[in-house]
Amino acid sequence: MMSGRPSFSNSAITWGTNAISNGGNTANQWRTLTKDEWDYLLNTRTASFGRFAKAYLFGSIHGIILFPDNYTHPSDVTAPTGINATDNTSWNNNEYNTEQWAKMEAAGAVFLPAAYSRYGNYVVTTSYGYWSSTAYGDQGRAAYYLNFGGNNLSVTDMSRYYGYSVRFVKDVN
């Protein structure tokens, strides 16, 4: 090893086994939602308006709008349809421009854009999702994720070979 330079291993044995330290279990740090937190957001919490709706923002971005527990929809913006629908409710039924979305966001709504997933070197244009921080099974080869591709909206497990987006959150005091 040359002085001042780190050493690297090309051994396949060390790939994917190095510990990763993050703020996931540290107070007031950014982290990824757990499986139970995704389930809570989508399925079990009580919300005054609804928990979520599929939407199409700015004429080009599909995704999911998450509504806060106490949400009042802006009176001059068309209310979304298909609230809490996990079936094939169309994204295009709820189309919002920049001005409309700004009002919804000011009222507390959050938008999760539908980013394509990856499978090895391939982009999968029919599967969208966000990883959770919860592993599935004993081997750690799979994890739970929020799946909202096609006609589905659920929290389920998938091999970590697939590449999904992550959404970082930070607890608010």
Model-inferred region functions:
Residues 5, 10-12, 16-173:
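C-terminal, surface-exposed recognition/capping segments
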